[in-house]
Amino acid sequence: MNPIRKIIHIDMDCFYAAIEMRDFPELANKPIAVGGDAKRRGVIATCNYAARQFGIRSAMPTAHALKLCRELILRPVRMDVYQKESQYIRSLLTEYTDLIEPLSLDEAYLDVTESTQCQGSATWIAEEIRARIYQTRQLTASAGIAPNKSLAKIASDWHKPNGQMVIRPEDVSAFVLDLPVRKLFGVGPKMEEKLGALNIKTCADLQRYSVEYLLQKFGTMGQRLYELARGIDNRPVNPERIRKSISVEETYPKDLPNSEACLAVLPELMARLEARIQRAGKISGIHNLFVKLKFNDFQQTTIERVMDKLDLIVLRQLIQEGFARRGMPVRLLGIGIKLKQENTYQSVQLPLLDL
């Protein structure tokens, strides 16, 4: 019988912004954001909690963020600095387990099931890791401890910033009952809206539906919803996980009727993609750009082109070519990059959204 797993999700608190406040103490307690220049149509990569009180968030156009908060202090992205901090923290994590799955520069999963550190207590391991990060780097981290990855990630967000939460195996069934479905992995605003139309707001509501019904209603996502609503997630922590692509997509409440409508929403998708690439840190270089369109008859097409950089003009061309394949209203539009599968890593130069 396999032992009950002990999974920790470590999530640095507003990582880039926290580094800026540490390195420039005069910024403490002031609303700051890290991102591109508003004059060049840049986007916010991240911001501190003081800025979030004004409604500022990652992937927001910098110009809009400055309208929300005129006192906002904008800091340029110092990716080399953030990468060095991330490497230091990751080396610290390896003292506790070899089973580490980094998700980005500022978060990672750890499987400490077999760890003998801190008397084998996942709670104590998480506390010690967070304390050591603060003592050595003057940065705070939040942590979630649970029997699986999805619950650990939910828990790490529960007492942010600079806190942690434990979901014990015997508490899982009770914990998920009142959990809003929007907290589940893969449930974004559109899926939350679809579930809400069925009066599904919590996992308890979701548990009332059979897996057959959920599969019929939501396809393969239905199986995932069925399991997550019961606190089930058997995905292993995968140290060998290699990111092959970075993408964003949106399902629209009203179909996009033509290619012009698709092009009109491209700037927002581009801003989100740029922010996601920035958060990924060093990547192995861009190999392809691609566009995905799902039409209102649920048929899907993907079109890509070999490119070594993010290029707005090429993405526009791909959208037009993809739309022409069926010429029907579009319900989902996505854009992304495929990465070179090499051992040499680099920072990608982004176009700063000169739209």
UniProtKB/Swiss-Prot annotation:
GO cellular component: cytosol
Cofactor(s) needed for function: Mg(2+)
Catalytic activity: DNA(n) + a 2'-deoxyribonucleoside 5'-triphosphate = DNA(n+1) + diphosphate
GO molecular function (one): DNA-directed DNA polymerase activity
E.C. numbers: 2.7.7.7
Keyword line: Cytoplasm, DNA damage, DNA repair, DNA replication, DNA-binding, DNA-directed DNA polymerase, Magnesium, Metal-binding, Mutator protein, Nucleotidyltransferase, Transferase
Short name of one Pfam family: IMS
Cofactor binding remark: Binds 2 magnesium ions per subunit.
Sequence positions that bind Mg(2+): D11, D106
Family annotation (InterPro entries): DNA/RNA_pol_sf, DNA_pol_Y-fam_lit_finger_sf, DNA_pol_Y-fam_little_finger, DNA_polymerase-Y, DNApol_IV, IMS_HHH_1, Rev_trsase/Diguanyl_cyclase, UmuC
CDD domains: PolY_Pol_IV_kappa
Localisation per UniProt entry: Cytoplasm
UmuC domain: residues covered: 7-188
Main subcellular location of this protein, as a coarse class: cytoplasm
Site features described as Substrate discrimination, chain residue numbers: Y16
Keyword Nucleus found: no
Any one Gene Ontology BP term: SOS response
Enzymatic class: transferase
Keyword Ligase attached: no
UniProt record similarity statement: Belongs to the DNA polymerase type-Y family.
Summary of the function given for this chain in its UniProt record: Poorly processive, error-prone DNA polymerase involved in untargeted mutagenesis. Copies undamaged DNA at stalled replication forks, which arise in vivo from mismatched or misaligned primer ends. These misaligned primers can be extended by PolIV. Exhibits no 3'-5' exonuclease (proofreading) activity. May be involved in translesional synthesis, in conjunction with the beta clamp from PolIII.
Name of protein: DNA polymerase IV
